[in-house]
Amino acid sequence: MASSVTPLGSWVLLHHHPSTILTQSRSRSPPSLITLKPISLTPKRTVSSSSSSSLITKEDNNLKSSSSSFDFMSYIIRKADSVNKALDSAVPLREPLKIHEAMRYSLLAGGKRVRPVLCIAACELVGGEESLAMPARCAVEMIHTMSLIHDDLPCMDNDDLRRGKPTNHKVYGEDVAVLAGDALLSFAFEHLASATSSEVSPARVVRAVGELAKAIGTEGLVAGQVVDISSEGLDLNNVGLEHLKFIHLHKTAALLEASAVLGGIIGGGSDEEIERLRKFARCIGLLFQVVDDILDVTKSSQELGKTAGKDLIADKLTYPKLMGLEKSREFAEKLNTEARDQLLGFDSDKVAPLLALANYIANRQN
């Protein structure tokens, strides 16, 4: 990812290859130019070409068997319940009451808890205990909630409904909503830094803090959001798939990526394992957004628990708008396959939650 965002008119979009996801190059470019380079999503293998085909087929069959026999709904309900209890404990109702009420209103409003579950599953995949990841998974959910509060504000998406309830600023006012988001953002880092078990080395905690900070700044969420805002009303002839990918690799995938990477770091994963988790999460992050865009034009507000069709009304750039509905569905299937490819070679039992999570994101209905 690049360290800055340049004006929309100066983008140069490179060709898209089916086996890559495009992200920004770290090399210095002229101020008016953003270059993109492909990152291969295919995990490195050490097997010979003569045996690779049979090995891949065997591994893929093992993954499919593991995924199909795994009760993901029971898993996610159980993990989400433990996350909800931890969040309730981490952010108690105290003085000043109004700000803590506003923080808790959005933080404890339910939701799928996909990011904390991803953090847990990644931690366990590399051999860590679930308890080690508790502060990290709470931190990513606090930051995710902050992003929702701010995203719903009149100056952003101007939304009235979130998770089936009035948005934070509709209940507490814009001023308190902004402060509630700010408070959740700062407390997320405090919680990650101070509540992580002493079993985790200080070096790994510092690394986790750095990853989380990067994911939400101008190399992550903020970059995606500002380009998204600037893209409203753009002529489709002037943008392409890579442009839309940039937005959502930063705005949506970055925090999912951080969730998986934090789990891998806290769980004691190797650099190779952490990078494979990063690429897996990057794929499901894009997948999440593609499906979200599809649902926005195919489901009602009641079914979604939030305002349906808002992107169409706001003239936002979306995958169905750029590619059409059927091509968007095909792209979602491709991303799910690429995500699964990153998990080849891991223990089939430990990898089951991540496989099921990818399928859940691909097939969700709200």
Curated annotation (Swiss-Prot):
Region called Disordered, residue ranges: 44-65
Entry GO CC: chloroplast stroma; chromoplast
Binding-site list for Mg(2+) 2: D151, D157
Localisation: Plastid, Chloroplast stroma; Plastid, Chromoplast
Broad class of the protein's primary localization: plastid
Pathway recorded for this protein: Isoprenoid biosynthesis; farnesyl diphosphate biosynthesis; farnesyl diphosphate from geranyl diphosphate and isopentenyl diphosphate: step 1/1; Isoprenoid biosynthesis; geranyl diphosphate biosynthesis; geranyl diphosphate from dimethylallyl diphosphate and isopentenyl diphosphate: step 1/1; Isoprenoid biosynthesis; geranylgeranyl diphosphate biosynthesis; geranylgeranyl diphosphate from farnesyl diphosphate and isopentenyl diphosphate: step 1/1
Reactions catalysed: isopentenyl diphosphate + dimethylallyl diphosphate = (2E)-geranyl diphosphate + diphosphate; isopentenyl diphosphate + (2E)-geranyl diphosphate = (2E,6E)-farnesyl diphosphate + diphosphate; isopentenyl diphosphate + (2E,6E)-farnesyl diphosphate = (2E,6E,10E)-geranylgeranyl diphosphate + diphosphate
Family: Belongs to the FPP/GGPP synthase family.
Protein name as it appears in the record: Geranylgeranyl pyrophosphate synthase, chloroplastic/chromoplastic
Native species: Sinapis alba
